[in-house]
Structures are given as structure tokens and as C-alpha cells.
Amino acid sequence: MKIKTRFAPSPTGYLHVGGARTALYSWLFARHQDGEFVLRIEDTDLERSTQDAIDAIMDGMNWLSLNWDEGPYYQTKRFDRYNAVIDQMLENGTAYKCYCSKERLEALREQQMEKGDKPRYDGHCRGSHEHHADNEPHVVRFLNPQEGSVIFNDRIRGPIEFSNQELDDLIIRRTDGSPTYNFCVVIDDWDMEITHVIRGEDHINNTPRQINILKALGAPVPEYAHVSMILGDDGKKLSKRHGAVGVMQYRDDGYLPEALLNYLVRLGWSSGDQEIFSIDEMKSLFSLDAVNKSASAFNTEKLQWLNHHYINHLPAEYVATHLSWHIEQAGLDTRTGPQLSELVGLLGERCKTLKEMADSCRYFYEDFAEFDADAAKKHLRPVARQPLELVREKLAAITSWTAENIHHAIQGTADELGQGMGKVGMPLRVAVTGAGQSPGVDVTVHAIGQQRSLARIDKALAFIAERETQQ
């Protein structure tokens, strides 16, 4: 049997982390089994579905490289198919027209609530032979079995049973003639030959209704796996406050797709004590049997730790391709500074995100207007004038501009003056970066370049001279 899974988001908002994890699990299960992965857009909610949301879903899937083999299919383009099946069900008696008014249904609901009963349709129009005009408003309901139970073996949670008496006759076509979500899903899974439905636990209550419709149609019933929800680190429902933002916001915030995928796969699944997984390892090891039944807690610090790992362990050239977007957003012209791959090597250890890297690299490409006040007050004092003058002289004399030769110039200055490296290195760092923190001063000066470094030292010496006149 060919394994076939699907990811079927509703385009009423962005692709959030819960949806992305569901997509990842469905994708990994298919890839692990050499199966196929289908993308389906469930856009039956015409009022809330938007093109912007569809675009956001596509962007998120593409950024995460969760490629699909079929689709994207759109439910709004399949209404003729759904209605044809409903008409067939009306003919063979597995569905019926319901003419109950909104007022009757509201009164029924109130009566049931007063008695403490679960609100459900009472089957008033089931088997009715009353004559109605063709144009009289009505819905179509599925004739749900009234005896027995629906039992399915959830691949994550084990056997789950629902009594058919607890399930009312589901509306499958609205008064306006449009098919409903639960029905469209069933026909799609049947037509697309989906073998495994992996989705959030909020769909568990839909499953027995969908199974009954499939059985009434004589269609094969797929296997189901319902993934637990994601909570915030405080145990409450995940919200924006915890980091529940769209997938592309993680891109904007400077995360690598590998880091987010690694984080999401571990958010409910494990393989021993291993924490770091490449995409190939995920595909090789993933199993629904190892997915947790309990809810998982979202932890931004763990995601940042993974991102820092990938920034420093993926090839710098690859990381640079993702960094370039953030550099563009920062408005930096990188033609007169170090290659971005070199920048990754310089700043990787210091930065948890690519956005942080882009924000902290400006001095490599642009001259700064003024020195950081605290750093200048501490390190650009009159006592720093002699070390800066001497190290400038040595840097200007370098004919082969390498980090090693720059290091020798700094060390030589310190030795010549009988001072520690810090007495030379710190004023030099502030002089060339404008700040008190940077990667190693030798590699920083090398990346900034010879002429730009010398000009900035001159600026620092002028700053010190002005400071001396004010004393």
C-alpha cells in the first residue's frame, strides 16, 4: 500500500507553530515510508479565508522546505464534486433534507440545555414524508447510525470509542447550497487516497462523524493520529505572548529553518536522548509510535540554543544566504566590507539569531557617527593616545593584510610599550568599531580593512586630542 498523508490548513490566518509541526509530522511520516505528501487548502469558510493567508501558508511551507507531491488542492474548486456526492446520498437514503427553522433549532437547544442534556439535533426531519416546495429553504443532513459505536485505533493515543447515540445528524450542505467542512474533508481524503490523517487533537471529535460518512459511502477509512497541543512554558494555551507567531515571523526574527524544524520535531517526539537532528535523520528515525500523548511546552530559550548551534555548525556560505535577507532589511551595502560568509564566522559565537548578527555588524560596512559613550569614556582616554599612535604606525606598514600580521602589530605595540595586550587592544577595538564589544580585535580589524581601520584610528586620536584640551 502506498502511504499518503496530507496537510490541510484553513487559510484564515498565518501558519503558526502548531500547524507547522503538524505539517512536519505528516511530511516526515510520508518521507520515512517513501510515500506521498499532499497539500490541501481547506477554504470553505468563504468569509474568513484570504489570499494573504494562503500566501503565508505557502511561504512558510517553502521556507521550511516541506515540499509536497500533490496540490495545492483548493476545496472551493471542488464544490461540484461534493454536491454530486451529496445528491447521490440523498437518492440512496444516507442523507436527508432538513427543513427545521432556525427558531425551532434554537428552542430545541434551550430545552436540552435546561435539562442538562448535550445539545444535539433530535432527528425531527429524519424519515419525514411531508411535502415541501423545491425552493423551500433547507439543509442536508447525514443519516448517522443510531446503534453501536465508532471505534478507531489512534496511532498516537490508542483505541478511541464514540457511541453513535452521542453523534447527531451532521449538516453536510448548508441552506445556501455550500457543502460543510466535515463533509468536504471526507470526500477529499477519499478522492486523494489519503492513508494516514495526522492532525491536531482538536479534531478528535470530528473523527467518528467522518468515519461514519466514509462507511456510508463504501470508502476506505484512513488511519488517524491526533497530535497533542502545544502549551506555553507556563502551562497555559500557547499565545503570542509565548511565541505563537506565524512561521515567517521566525524567519524575520533571525531563525534558520533547520533550527525551527529541529525544535518542532522534538516538541512531542523523541529518539533516545538525541537533541540535534538533521533533516535526513528526522526522515530516517521518525515514527508515530514515539510521539507523546501529553501536551508539549514551547520554550523560546531552547529554540535560541538550537539556532545558535545551527548558525555555527552549518556551512558559513549557506548561513550567509539566509543572513543576506536580514542585511537587506538593515539597509546595509555589503560591497565595501567582508563577505557575509566571513561575517558568519566572525559573529556566529556571539549571536543567537541572524537578526542579531545583522544588527551588530553595521561597523563592518558603515562608518559610525560617534563612539559609544561608555566605551569611549573608559578606553579613549589620554593614556590611550600613545598605544593607538604606535599601533596605527605598525598597521599602516603591513603589506600583507592578514589577521596574523595584525595580531603581531598589536602584540609588538604592547611589547614595545611594556604593556598588556588589553591596554592596546581595547582602545583599538573602540577606535575601529565605535563600541566596547566585538569579535577578536585582530580579526575585526582585518575584516574592516586597512584604510578604513586607519581612518577610524585617526578619528579616535582626534577624539582623544579634543578630550585632552578639555581637561
From Swiss-Prot:
A motif ('KMSKS' region) lies at residues 237-241. Keywords: Aminoacyl-tRNA synthetase, ATP-binding, Cytoplasm, Ligase, Nucleotide-binding, Protein biosynthesis. ATP binds at K240. One of its GO terms (molecular function) is ATP binding. A motif ('HIGH' region) lies at residues 9-19. It is found in: Cytoplasm. Transmembrane segments: none annotated. GO terms for biological process: glutamyl-tRNA aminoacylation. InterPro entries: aa-tRNA-synth_I_cd-bd, aa-tRNA-synth_I_codon-bd_sub2, aa-tRNA-synth_I_CS, aa_tRNA-synth_I_cd-bd_sf, Glu-tRNA-ligase_bac/mito, Glu/Gln-tRNA-synth, Glu/Gln-tRNA-synth_Ib_cat-dom, GluQ/Sye. It catalyses: tRNA(Glu) + L-glutamate + ATP = L-glutamyl-tRNA(Glu) + AMP + diphosphate. GO terms for cellular component: cytosol. Its EC number is 6.1.1.17. Pfam families: Anticodon_2, tRNA-synt_1c. Catalyzes the attachment of glutamate to tRNA(Glu) in a two-step reaction: glutamate is first activated by ATP to form Glu-AMP and then transferred to the acceptor end of tRNA(Glu). Belongs to the class-I aminoacyl-tRNA synthetase family. Glutamate--tRNA ligase type 1 subfamily. PANTHER family: GLUTAMATE--TRNA LIGASE, GLUTAMATE--TRNA LIGASE, MITOCHONDRIAL-RELATED. NCBIfam families: gltX_bact (TIGR00464). Monomer. This is Glutamate--tRNA ligase. It comes from Pectobacterium atrosepticum (strain SCRI 1043 / ATCC BAA-672) (Erwinia carotovora subsp. atroseptica).
